[in-house]
Amino acid sequence: MEVVIKKKRKRGRRIFIWASSIVLLLVISAAIFLNIYTLKSMPKIDGTIKLEDLQQAVTVKRDSKGVPHIKSENAHDLYFSQGYVQAQDRLFQMDLSRRQASGMLSEVVGEAAVDRDKLFRTLGLRRAAEASVGQYDGEAKYALQSFADGVNAFIREAKKEKKLPVEFTILGYEPAEWSIVDTLTIGKYMAFDLGGHWHGQAFRYWALKNLPKEQANELFPAYPKDAPRLLAELKNTNVDVAQSFSKTIIPPEFNGSNNWVVSGEKSASGKPILADDPHLSLATPSIWYQTRLEMKGLNVSGVIFAGVPGVILGHNDKIAWGVTNTGPDVQDLYIEKRNPNNENEFLYNDKWEKATVVDESIKVKGGKTIPYNVTITRHGPVISEFADKGKEKTKTVFSLKWTALEPSAELKAVLNMNKAKDWNEFETALQDFHTPTQNFVFASNDGTIAYKANGNIPVRKKGDGSLPVQGGQMNMNGKGISRLINFQK
């Protein structure tokens, strides 16, 4: 009897060893295959690449850290090459960035991203980018299109040679062509990433609705004591904040960005010292893409966001500059009263006013399409219903007015900043930089130092943006836009 038991144990042990060996062999084989496939998909960064769209020869040298130094004879080739090289290094990141900002993640990752897509479709960053294309002309539009053409040259090459980054193979899709709108949408996303005051207004509204006035004031004591009328009005409205925003994505606050500039009068070298330390969201790969761009009349080094041409912070032969977030309140929630007989009409100045309804149907991986409409009042998109799943439309909603949803041309400013030779040219370039509002520090070879908080900020009629305001009253909030100017030496 004992012999039989021992034989069974030995047989079981052998089966376990064989099974473990097979599993281990499969794991090792898969790892080897994945490694070989990944290496095969790596872009060519040595030797000569022939691209039909280039007008003249371009040199791309990568330093010991892999940073590309691009030198060309003309603007088209410079930005075309920047787009091509960025796509070599960051195409998957670029594609996910435009998809997230556009509300198109579900198409490649499935239903888990639907609520996130609804949020970004509702906000309308891509709609704002599409409206901004008309703000660009001349050299700026030429640079944007050249950059997009460079990205597309790499996409076509990678598809043809079956060398797309391995992430595309894992997710089972190929990237669509790049466009100017994609670049501008990523720019608008940065305003989202660096903003987020509306959720504070929503929380204060909830506190006033659910807590005694004294306790609510303890949570935001800066609220003016002599403004009881607004509090009373809010008490008589009803937006379910907890339900409306339970699925929202609020950018994490990594507070503490800093930049500073010191006059040469106070430095050992006699030259200005400039330092810049912007704290943005942690990401892998980094949100920043470092590069150097050189052609006649331009020699600029620094960083930019993947998917965007130029350099957002850095230096050229004459000047250096840094950027951090100013963080002003540029968002306002409006309390909109819906017509009980027509869900697409809202009260304004004692009349029912028809809202715009935009079809933002969401494609989901696997072929499914989810119908989704975005309602836009005169103030902005209705954002308090994006996560509702088939619920009856509420009588009162929040709409969002936000400077980033206006047409603007920040990348025109960036490209002109890159070429600026002194403070006057740099400040002139900033006239096109509207959102997000940023702190710019500046230093030049001639010893000039300057600081300017630059961007569009709402001028509120009552001087306070801590709470939502009634959308049905004419000019209840907003008297225009203020542009900030600060010290210069």
Residue ranges and their predicted role:
Residues L280-L293, N424-F433:
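Short active-site loop/helix that positions an aromatic residue
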Residues K71, Y79-F80, G270-K271, L282-P285, ...:
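Short helix/loop capping segments that flank catalytic or ligand/cofactor-binding pockets
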Residues T435-K489:
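Hydrophobic alpha-helical segments
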Residues N299-V300, F305-I370:
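Compact, glycine/acidic-enriched structural inserts
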Residues V3, L34-I273, P278, A306:
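Substrate-recognition/specificity elements adjacent to catalytic centers across diverse enzyme folds
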Residues K8-L51:
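N-terminal type II signal-anchor transmembrane helix
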Residues N152-K160, K419, Q431-Q438:
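Sec-exported extracytoplasmic/periplasmic mature domains
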Residues V60, E410, V414-D432:
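Alpha/propeptide regions of enzymes that mature by internal proteolysis
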